[in-house]
Design a protein with these regions (language model features):
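Intrinsic-disorder/low-complexity coil detector
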Residues: 1-2, 70
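NAD(P)+-binding Rossmann beta1-loop-alpha1 motif at the extreme N-terminus of oxidoreductases
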Residues: 2-60
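Short, structurally constrained coil/turn elements
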Residues: 10-12, 66, 113
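Conserved N-terminal Rossmann-fold NAD(P) cofactor-binding segment
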Residues: 38-90
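Rossmann-like NAD(P)(H) cofactor-binding subdomain of soluble oxidoreductases
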Residues: 68-120
């Protein structure tokens, strides 16, 4: 691991991208947002519309019920943003889509990642 990468990984200003904001991805996004992290969600259909209109709703025994305003985009929208601005590149990408949908987000990952991005 390079020194630059080590410094980035200890920095609290990491940008997190959650690709697939269903049960698993939504929980990860919610807990990261509650911890004050810079989180962006990738969703589609009704999930995307609900997150944009009402916010991300997190139900947790630990944190109770929370509604969080988190930026949400389609994969295509975010890929276009990331292609046009280095500021939109993610430091950490959580892939939380169903197995049969992984192929559909490879282009997003290519465009949203920089050379030191961690993909989980």
């Amino acid at each position: 691991m390079s020194q630059t990468n080590t410094l980035q990984m200890t920095n609290n200003n990491l940008k997190y991208l959650i690709a697939g904001t269903g049960g698993v991805g939504g929980s990860i996004a919610g807990f990261l947002a509650l911890a004050g992290k810079d989180v962006t969600c990738i969703a589609r259909g009704e999930h995307l519309a609900a997150i944009r209109e009402y916010g991300l709703r997190l139900h947790s025994d630990l944190k109770g019920e929370q509604t969080l305003k988190i930026p949400a985009y389609t994969a295509e929208e975010y890929a276009a943003l990331a292609s046009s601005s280095a500021d939109c590149k993610a430091d950490v990408i959580f892939v939380c889509v169903k197995g049969y949908s992984v192929d559909s987000i490879t282009e997003l990952i290519k465009r949203a990642a920089h050379k030191d991005t961690v993909v989980i």
